[in-house]
Amino acid sequence: MGQKVNPVGLRLGINRNWTSRWFPSARTAPSNIDEDNKIRKFLKKELYYAGVSQIVIERAAKKLRVTVVAARPGLIIGKKGVDIEKVKEGLKTLIKKEVSINIKEVKRPQADAQLAAENVATQLEKRVAFRRAMKKVMQAALKSGAKGVKVRVSGRLAGAEIARTEWYMEGRVPLHTLRAKIDYGFAEAMTVYGIIGVKVWIFKGEVLQKGIQFEKKEEVKEEREPRRSRRGRQ
């Protein structure tokens, strides 16, 4: 099962959190979901140059707060905060609401799965050999402290007539282990031959709750009674 499903969705509530954090009612849920989708599409398009890894949307009463996690936050803020104000005005025009935006920096961009997937997609659009692009991203992630990386590309690779899937993996990527911290990213490369899908899994180590310790079970050897002789009494 771990090989098929989205590893982030599988670990929600264990070691991953939701990216849309609000409590809906039956009346407001559809409009909130539609708004979240519009906000994400707008920010991804407008801030693509900044390397956006994650967009977290929080709602409390009538307040709407958006947190953008990016590799280059300085490009989003701009000189004296001019660029961030333009983004706020664009969101206000889009959803007709006041929005507060927080910017966070990705500490290790090379070990971020979403940024790695977008990096591979960008290289494929520039006609870089797909194997070279995949291996380059994997090496960068491992150097940044990742314990395992898996990259998969699907489509008309190298302009082939028949679409196929190829993948490479280095290190450990335990998708079935729920306590494993697996980062997942997906991107699409728009090439002249068609769309190529890129998926990246990065294993960053295992996360255990504080206070939980695993005790080694002592082996208990049962003492058996001596076997009775099968021979009859003489």
UniProtKB/Swiss-Prot annotation:
The keyword RNA-binding applies. GO terms for molecular function: mRNA binding; rRNA binding; structural constituent of ribosome. One of its GO terms (biological process) is translation. GO terms for cellular component: cytosolic small ribosomal subunit. Keywords: Ribonucleoprotein, Ribosomal protein, RNA-binding, rRNA-binding. Pfam families: KH_2, Ribosomal_S3_C. Part of the 30S ribosomal subunit. Forms a tight complex with proteins S10 and S14. Belongs to the universal ribosomal protein uS3 family. This is Small ribosomal subunit protein uS3. It comes from Helicobacter acinonychis (strain Sheeba). The gene is rpsC.
